[in-house]
């Protein structure tokens, strides 16, 4: 990339993906007035395959592969991701270089009839495509019927409005970003249901040899968010957790200290392995690894081994 070349952002065409791309474009141009930034839109396999559970067709990595190929082939310079959708591994030559300030990491309960999970009647139908949400919902309410829910935010809300579900669970951050917060009947606190790794944060991936771009992106990095997400992702990497596994985590900062809580669950909610750890913020990555190993020793290894065997 030459010093005068425009920055090209690879993005999916969904409203939320475009919001994230425009957010990064605007932040780059605010930090570097006069900088040219273009969007390169594309359709990914994850956008096309809507009739099969994600876990059976490759997980949420389906949403990023085409963007990564575009960067490796020089058709785009960076890609913007919702951190909860980013696989733990990157192709050679690419990496996560910037994490922007985190939005609300909680899940949101959305319904046209009921205000919260407790109000749902026996056998109510709840929509989600997340095994993490499914296992925590079923642990709390084993009577619920969990029904697969795919598509972008608007599509999911449309299916709720068509009467296919009594309620659906979505990421609060996505609804807020799309100015759909009025659809949220209640927030599901981390104490009741742990969010996904990195939920609510936006990350930027680019070629690791693109020194000019990495320098331009520096002002967009949010250190507090980056430390929290680093801790959560280190835990997930050690668990070898893909994006479609029942793993939840949530971290908080307190001055120079960081606290991490995590869980691994059976998809049907019948068994949950939980743990938490705290320590110095500078040791965030090591703390995530330590907690993951504790979870594995406490029973998570058996849950994950069985799950991966079933998905093959």
From Swiss-Prot:
List the keywords (alphabetical).
Porphyrin biosynthesis, Transferase
Listed PROSITE patterns: PORPHOBILINOGEN_DEAM
Q: Which InterPro entries match?
A: HemC, Porphobilin_deaminase_cofac_BS, Porphobilin_deaminase_N, Porphobilinogen_deaminase_C, Porphobilinogen_deaminase_C_sf
**Pathway connected to this protein:** Porphyrin-containing compound metabolism; protoporphyrin-IX biosynthesis; coproporphyrinogen-III from 5-aminolevulinate: step 2/4
Highest rank taxon of the organism: Bacteria
Keyword Transferase included in the entry's annotation: yes
Q: Give a short account of what the protein does.
A: Tetrapolymerization of the monopyrrole PBG into the hydroxymethylbilane pre-uroporphyrinogen in several discrete steps.
What is known about its subunit structure? Monomer.
Q: What is this protein called?
A: Porphobilinogen deaminase
State the organism of origin: Vibrio atlanticus (strain LGP32)
């Amino acid at each position: 990339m030459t010093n005068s070349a425009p920055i090209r952002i690879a993005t999916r065409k969904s409203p939320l993906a475009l919001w994230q791309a425009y957010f990064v474009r605007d932040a780059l141009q605010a930090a570097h007035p006069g900088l040219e930034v273009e969007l390169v839109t594309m359709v990914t396999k994850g956008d096309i395959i809507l009739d099969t559970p994600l876990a059976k067709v490759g997980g949420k990595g389906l949403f990023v592969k085409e963007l990564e190929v575009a960067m490796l082939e020089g058709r785009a310079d960076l890609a913007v991701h919702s951190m909860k959708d980013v696989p733990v591994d990157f192709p050679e030559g690419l990496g996560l270089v910037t994490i922007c300030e985190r939005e609300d990491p909680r899940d949101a309960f959305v319904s046209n009839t009921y205000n919260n999970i407790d109000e749902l009647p026996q056998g109510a139908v709840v929509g989600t495509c997340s095994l993490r949400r499914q296992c925590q919902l079923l642990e709390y309410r084993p009577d619920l019927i969990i029904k697969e829910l795919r598509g972008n935010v608007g599509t999911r809300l449309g299916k709720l409005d068509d009467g296919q579900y009594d309620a659906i669970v979505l990421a609060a951050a996505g609804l807020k970003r799309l100015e759909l917060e009025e659809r949220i009947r209640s927030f599901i606190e981390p104490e009741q249901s742990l969010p996904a790794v990195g939920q609510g944060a936006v990350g930027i991936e680019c070629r690791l040899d693109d020194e000019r771009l990495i320098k331009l992106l520096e002002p967009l990095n949010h250190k507090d968010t980056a430390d929290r997400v680093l801790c959560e992702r280190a835990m997930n990497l050690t668990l070898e957790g893909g994006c479609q596994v029942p793993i939840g985590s949530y971290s908080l900062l307190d001055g120079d200290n960081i606290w991490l809580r995590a869980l691994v669950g059976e998809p049907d909610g019948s068994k949950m392995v939980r743990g938490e750890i705290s320590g110095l913020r500078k040791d965030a990555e090591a703390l995530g690894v330590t907690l993951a190993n504790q979870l594995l020793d406490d029973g998570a290894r058996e849950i994950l081994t069985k799950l991966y065997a079933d998905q093959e």
